[in-house]
Every structure is written in structure tokens, then in C-alpha cells.
Amino acid sequence: MYVRNLTGSFRFSLSFLLCFCLFVPSIYAIDGVYHAPYGIDDLYEIQATERSPRDPVAGDTVYIKITTWPIESGQTAWVTWTKNGVNQAAVGAAFKYNSGNNTYWEANLGTFAKGDVISYTVHGNKDGANEKVIGPFTFTVTGWESVSSISSITDNTNRVVLNAVPNTGTLKPKINLSFTADDVLRVQVSPTGTGTLSSGLSNYTVSDTASTTWLTTSKLKVKVDKNPFKLSVYKPDGTTLIARQYDSTTNRNIAWLTNGSTIIDKVEDHFYSPASEEFFGFGEHYNNFRKRGNDVDTYVFNQYKNQNDRTYMAIPFMLNSSGYGIFVNSTYYSKFRLATERTDMFSFTADTGGSAASMLDYYFIYGNDLKNVVSNYANITGKPTALPKWAFGLWMSANEWDRQTKVNTAINNANSNNIPATAVVLEQWSDENTFYIFNDATYTPKTGSAAHAYTDFTFPTSGRWTDPKAMADNVHNNGMKLVLWQVPIQKWTSTPYTQKDNDEAYMTAQNYAVGNGSGGQYRIPSGQWFENSLLLDFTNTAAKNWWMSKRAYLFDGVGIDGFKTDGGEMVWGRSNTFSNGKKGNEMRNQYPNEYVKAYNEYARSKKADAVSFSRSGTQGAQANQIFWSGDQESTFGAFQQAVNAGLTASMSGVPYWSWDMAGFTGTYPTAELYKRATEMAAFAPVMQFHSESNGSSGINEERSPWNAQARTGDNTIISHFAKYTNTRMNLLPYIYSEAKMASDTGVPMMRAMALEYPKDTNTYGLTQQYMFGGNLLIAPVMNQGETNKSIYLPQGDWIDFWFGAQRPGGRTISYTAGIDDLPVFVKFGSILPMNLNAQYQVGGTIGNSLTSYTNLAFRIYPLGTTTYDWNDDIGGSVKTITSTEQYGLNKETVTVPAINSTKTLQVFTTKPSSVTVGGSVMTEYSTLTALTGASTGWYYDTVQKFTYVKLGSSASAQSVVLNGVNKVEYEAEFGVQSGVSTNTNHAGYTGTGFVDGFETLGDNVAFDVSVKAAGTYTMKVRYSSGAGNGSRAIYVNNTKVTDLALPQTTSWDTWGTATFSVSLSTGLNTVKVSYDGTSSLGINFDNIAIVEQ
């Protein structure tokens, strides 16, 4: 966003502000009185002239807040009013305070009963003369009613209707239960019985008794207790409770706020929640990841910096650690209270707009796990729209790039520094009036109904944009795409601007703007971003088509590739009207969806691989492609909040997420922050840098690596940035495959640990590590000065992505992460499709080509039988790679699908005795260079522990067998060392080095090792003992098991292996090789191996 919010202690309508600005004080008069019952319906800021509360409930004390002006003695304010049509005694307003040119008053009308109708008028005068009046205003008092019992049920074969009895009043509520899937229950409650109830599947059976009714599908059993009423949901066994409503004898469950007859203002439900339950999701949230103990608002809001519990993306969908989710099917404001009213209860309440036909409508979503719950939610609200491959490279953006020369310079800088970008985003490209015409373009204005073609414009050589089409061509010729900024407003300005004025006149005449509820156009309130501007009604098809026609030339003539759709949090007030028949209070959350959807669909109608990049939305937003986390400062705290936002967004079904890495605004990031942010952003769904301009100060604020290097003085920033962006391009085949899985299933790419491992309670509070796709665990360093990172590894075996060190899971480890290091772990059993450069280097220069591979590679970490579905967009289909590990037979088999190009397997095993493809023995090469020059063959890398198997193009599947292999050794240099050091000064070691100085009493190296099953294993110790025969004590799980003889080796450059049998327990074991009282001689220590017998 490039135009900042205006703030103030309170806000008035623009006309009211103008009356203050133009006021010339009268000495003996009152010039005005003002009261606005709802203000602008801002959830977070109550204006000084509102009614309190805005919507009174029985028992509330009602205050009428008033202002008069100017400030003069002798003024009086009061309220005249009626109750249920009967005149009441006038209520004088008490003076509260003076501020600026205004006096503020407050009148106490008292409390009321449900059903009371109050009409009031506000008055003010001075010394009993010159009276000013505003009003009348009306409100109807409501009160809570709830379901008490069920009188009867009706099975309609595709839905069951429960006829309910309320605890009070004369309404005849109906509860409609239906199933949209075997594990998804939809609950609709019509308090008046007049709402439109939906049908579902005929996939259930009903069992009814006088006291209970059971609804049964293959995956759920739903119990209805009739008196008192309560819903409970069980697993298919009918005894394992998943969730239940709160006992209505203690606290109401299903309830509604009503006047008793024709108004339903709010609807809600309450569920029992044991203290062990956690709550996640609710949209994009920046503060607490675990929401228990919090109230969460579903309210789209533009908070510039320091978002905390406010959000651009509010989604009424939550995940519960007990294995289910609840989606409240409403775009009105709603609130979730999560163990705040009662410590063993959560509830959700939704506004309704007041109609008698209003309903509570929510889905109870179950699944095999929480990922399945998110997938089921996507089935209801829409699957994520698939992204083109270019969306997953680096996006470059800066508000300093306000002219063509700067864009070309940025492209040149990226290329010259080997930084592979795939997108350029421009915010400061357009004039400040139409927002669709390039700055400094000259043209003849058209009527508001007409659209410009690119040829209508002339671009002066002295202007900022001398040839936009040539610029777009340059972007494309460098393998990148061009995205332009947009906002959904028709801007108001105090000075004329012909084209804008023509557009506004036509927009107004055609009723294309959002209405104000009084026959005119809604204008954004004073004090808000783009105040007094019109807002396009994107629910109006004609309006949408007209709006987009103005922007057609950007595709047709310039050749852009998408839009950055900023803003959208611009609907203030409940009375605004839309073409779809909805009003402002129902459209505030929904408006960004309509806006972004319009741009997204239009862009993709112009180019199949176009995208939209947006900030705000609500349920279903995932169908509108990419979202970023809004405007944040360049601090470690904001970094942490951004990652939290990404995790909560992903828990809410939004898979394609990004942030302005290292922050958008504020103090320029330090080198440390910039590097740490780079590391994390390289493993985010979408990677981008962007920044706010510092205006005319002359200080360049762009967050590009070349500017960051210049600003911080750290001359390693560019190379560091290049390493991580190239690593991202190495992983692009994996990232793009995971993205396809996200669009197919709704399961996000960036997964909170609690989403991936919901049964492991250790994961619930982890917000500084996450899964990137199904195979990679990312643990960014997010605290200033931190170099030892605590990382929780869930059960299973994990491998350090960079170094190959093995780490058994089910525990927290400490990882040394220097400022240039990002901890990344791979699960055993993973298969990673990659694109590596000519030297097979991860992080080496690879370029930004999306249509070819330099070295297509598949990294395989064997464990049992695993498969991976690789999205081969170049080859045109999804292909499945299968790994079958049989270490008991000393064999690993990889089934490679038909791929019409050369590819290389990188299999994480010990060195094979031989490798075959299709039964034929392959040629072994002694160096990677030799293999690179060959068409096929294999090579073993003793450092990385990968067997490289190079395969040619094949029109059929290929079976590759590695013979004589076992699980990779545990390297001594990665063990827990005491009294020893590491070295590389002798040849023949494996891994990255060996343990040296292993020569005095107490020296030891400990390993955490993992085995699939308890039993006897062969343990091998690889060592060098050039000075004579040595020995070491071996401890397993703190028990000494043997003194291992280590016969002399020929020299310190030769290595021996000592072997013995050892009993190991299932899972994690600790093995320590120690110099104790029975040990002798100094040795060099390379590794240990655990071999199945």
C-alpha cells in the first residue's frame, strides 16, 4: 500500500467536518447539534457522538451522545422521546467536556425491556433560543431467547427438521440438520421458523425415541437430546465423543437476539470445551496462534502496522485440536469466544441484519486429521485457484520504482547479481487520479463511458514512463512477469481532473457506485484511506465490466500479467446498498472478495497465467489466489507477527501467502534482520520484497538486496540473498508440486506444526517453525542475536537438508545457526523433485527459466515404501516416483516414471555395491565431473551421502535398484562431542569431516539413533588409529555394552571398521563412544553405522 491512513481521536462524516472548517463563530448563537447513533460502525473506534450501545439489549443503560458548536456558555442539549408511541419526559444532556470548537454532552435514557420501541430527537440551544434539532432516531430493544427442547422431528430423507420450543416467547424455531459429506454436518437454525432451509445428502439413517434422536453416517453419529436440548457428535462407534453443545441447563446453547416477533439481530451457539482443547485459524492473525482464552472478531480491517489482533483477512472458520472445525456461514460480523465466558465453553455469535428470516448457519467439519478438515472446508467454500509456475519465483517491488529507468535498473541488478526473479510489481506507476493511466502520459480525455486504447497515449521522453510496452517487453525478455497495483475506488480530489471527473460522472449516473442507503452514492468516511471517494459496486456486473474496460489496454497494449489488488477494507456503515441486494453490514467482510474476484477473473480472461495479489478477504478468499500480510515495520517483532499471520492464514484454508520480507516501512532493516527474513521468505509460499518510499528525503528505502547491502554496509548480503533465491529455484519442482496439491485438496503449503501433527501436543505452541509442503521442516531464526535455535522434531527420523546430519525426532534439539544459516530438515521417506545447476549445487546459480531443467533431480530419503506425485508441468502431467527401501535385504528400489528428459536420482544411502536399471548394471564413475560428462551411470558422494544415478530419457517407467546399501551412517562430526574437535586434514573420511583429538580420559561422542523395531543390530565404527592398536568403550542408553578393539590402521590416511552386535529399542536410542578407564590410544573417529541383521 502506498497511501497511508489518516488517524484521529474520532471521525465524522465529511459534510460535518466541512461545517467545522467553514464555521465563523457567532457570539450569541448555537450553530449546530450533531448525533450519529451508529457512527460509521467501526468495531474498534467509538465516535464521540454515537448512541451507546449502538443496538440496545434489554437491561442496557442507553446513552445518547451529542455535540454542539461553537463552545459558548448558556448552551443546553436535551432529548425528547417516545416509548412504544407514548411521549416520555424529556431528558437533559449532561455536559461532558469541550474539545476544539465543540461541546460534548450525554443524555441517559435509562434501561428498557425486550420489544420496546424508542424514538428520539436531539435538541440544542443557547439561552433558550436559536434551537437546533437532529433526528428523529429509532431503535428497538432486543433480548436473548434460546432453544429449550424439541417437540417433534421430521425426516425429509435429505435433511432432518427439529421443531424446537424456546425458553421464552412465542417464536416457533426450526433446527435443520443435513450432511454435505459423510463427515460434514450442517446446522441451520431459523428462530422464527421462516428461514430458507437447505437440503443435503441422503447418506444417513435416523433412529428416534421419545428422548433422543440419532443421525448416523459412515463417519459420524449425531445425537439429539430432546429435553433439555443438546447436540452431540460422536465417531461412528457412537461412544467416542468428538464435541457437544453446552448443557442448556447451565448455559444456553443455540440462542438468538430478538424483539420477540419480527427482528432477529444475532444468532449463536455454545459448545463444551475441556481445558486440553486448543483453537486455531480464524483467518490471518498476527498475535496469538493458540486462541484459547481469547475473543476473536471476524471483521476485515485496515490496520497500518502493529496489527496484533486486527486483521485484513477475517475468516469465521476455526480448527479444534480435538479433530474438527466449525465454519460459520455468514459474512456479517461474528465473534468467537474461546473459553472467555466460561473456562469450559466456547461460543460463536453472528450478526444477522435484523430480518425475521435470519438464521444461524454453520458447518461442523470432521476429518481423518486436521488437514482433512481444512480440505473439507475448501470443498464447501471453494478450492484454491491454481497458480502459474512463475508465481513461485522471487517477486521484486519497491515504491521507489516510480519510473521506467528504475525498473530496468532493478532487472539489470538482479541479473548481474545472479538473483533469479520471476515477477516485478509496480505500485507507483499510475497517475494519482484515475489509477489506470500511466503517470505523465498525454492523451485526449474520453467520456466516462469510453475506454482508452494504448495507442491513445503519448509518453514523453521527459516523463517517468517513456514506453510502458517496451518496459513490459524487457520484463518478459528477462524471464519475468509484470504486475500493476490497483485500488477499488473512484478517487475524490478537491481539484478538477477531466478524465477522473468524466469517469465519476458516468459512474454516478449509471449507479455503478456502492449506494448510501438514501438514494445517493456512498463515500468513504473522513479520516479513512481515500476519504470521500466513491467505491465501485463489484456485485453489479455492468459496473464491473465498465471498470475493467478502462484497464483492458494494460493487457492488450502493454502486456501486463496481473494485478496487485490493494485495500478493500472500505465499507463503513450498515445502510450502504449493493446491487446484489445486500447492505453494508453484510458486505464489509465480503466486499474484498467481490473486488479481488473481479480483478482475478478479468486478468485470467486476458491471460491464462495471470494472477491477482491481494491483502484482504474472508471465507472463500482462497479462490482468489495470492495474499500478503499487509503493512508491517522492519523489526524482529513484526517478522514474528508476519510468520504468525502466515500460519493462521494457512490454518484457515489460504495456501498462497506472502509478506513484505524484512518489513515494509519504518527504520531500515539491519543486516541481521534482512538475512533472517531472506532465509524464511525463501521457504514461504510466495517470496517477495517490497517497501514504502521515503518521499522526497532522497534516502532509498527499497528492500532489494543490492540496496540492503549498500544501506547496511554488509558486503555479504547480495551473495546470501542469491544463495537462498537460487535454492528456492532449485526446489521449484517441489514447490510447484506442493502448490498443485494445495489447489487440488485445499491443504496449505505452509503448514503450522499443529496442522501437520495435530495429535502431538508439543506442536500446539510452535510458531517459529513450520512444514513447507509435506516433506520440509523450516525453522527460521526470528529473534535478534539468536544463533542457537531450539527446534522440535516430531516423531520419526529427520535429515539436515544442508549437511545430511540425521536427527531422530520426538524431541527438541539445539541447532547452531549462524546469521547466514537456516535450519531445514527433511523427513525420512521424502522425495524431493529439484532442478540443480550443472554442478548439482544447491544454492548455486540456476537462473529463472521455467520451461526447462538444467539437471532434473529427485532427492530420495528412503524409508519403507513411499511415493511422490511430481507436477511435471513441462512434460504435461503429474508423475509418481516410488521409493522402496529394503535394508533387511540391503536393497533400495526406485521406480521412475516415463520422463522424456535426462534426470538424476540422489538417493540418501550408504555406497552401493552396484546399481542396475531395468536389470542392467550401470557404470560407476569415481567423480561427479565424470558422471556429468556421461549420458548415464552412477557416482557416490561420500560427503553428502548421496548415490547419484543418472538416467536418460525414457518413454516408459524405469526400475533402478541400489544393491548392498543400508541406512546412512551417523557422522561423528554431527554427534554431541565432549573433549574432542573436528578436522579434515586426513584423506578418506566421509561426510564433512571427522573427530580429532579423541585421546584423553572422558573424551566422548554421543549419537541419538533411531531404529524401526527393537532387536539385535550390527554396529560399525569407522576410525583411524595410525599409532597402534586402540580401543573405546561403547555405551547404549547409558549402559556400557562393550570395550571395542580398534586395530591399528596403516596410516592416519587409512580407515578401519570395527564391528559388534548390539540390542536396540524401538525408536530413539543413545549410543556413546567414550574414552574411559579401559580405553587406549588416540584415534580419529569418522562415523557409526547401524545395520539390520
UniProtKB/Swiss-Prot annotation:
MF-aspect GO terms: carbohydrate binding; glycosyltransferase activity; hydrolase activity, hydrolyzing O-glycosyl compounds
Activity regulation: Strongly inhibited by Hg(2+) and moderately inhibited by Cu(2+) and Pb(2+). Other metal ions, Tris and EDTA have almost no effects.
pH dependency: Optimum pH is 6.0. Stable in the pH range 4.5 to 9.0.
Signal peptide residues on this chain, from the entry's feature table: 1-29
Record's keyword annotation contains Ribosomal protein: no
Cellular component per GO, a single term: extracellular region
Location of this chain's protein in the cell: Secreted
UniProt-listed PROSITE patterns: CBM6
One Pfam match: Gal_mutarotas_2
Keywords assigned: Carbohydrate metabolism, Glycosyltransferase, Secreted, Signal, Transferase
Xref: InterPro entries: CBM6 (IPR005084), Cellulose-bd_IV (IPR006584), Gal_mutarotase_sf_dom (IPR011013), Galactose-bd-like_sf (IPR008979), Glyco_hydro_31_C (IPR048395), Glyco_hydro_31_N_dom (IPR025887), Glyco_hydro_31_TIM (IPR000322), Glyco_hydro_b (IPR013780)
Organism domain of life: Bacteria
Primary localization: secreted
Keyword Signal (UniProt): yes
Active site: 566, 569, 631
Top class in the EC scheme: transferase
Biological processes annotated in GO: carbohydrate metabolic process
Positions of the CBM6 domain: 968-1091
PANTHER family cross-referenced by the UniProt entry: HYDROLASE, PUTATIVE (AFU_ORTHOLOGUE AFUA_1G03140)-RELATED, MALTASE-GLUCOAMYLASE
Function statement: Glycosyltransferase involved, together with CtsZ, in the conversion of alpha-1,4-glucan into a cyclic tetrasaccharide (CTS) constructed from four alpha-glucopyranosyl residues. Catalyzes the alpha-(1->3) transfer of the isomaltosyl moiety of alpha-isomaltosyl-(1->4)-D-maltotriose to another alpha-isomaltosyl-(1->4)-D-maltotriose, resulting in alpha-isomaltosyl-(1->3)-alpha-isomaltosyl-alpha-(1->4)-maltotriose formation. In addition, the enzyme catalyzes the intramolecular cyclization of the product, generating the cyclic tetrasaccharide cyclobis-(1->6)-alpha-nigerosyl.
Family note: Belongs to the glycosyl hydrolase 31 family.
Protein name from the UniProt record: Isomaltosyltransferase
Native source organism of the sequence: Sporosarcina globispora (Bacillus globisporus)
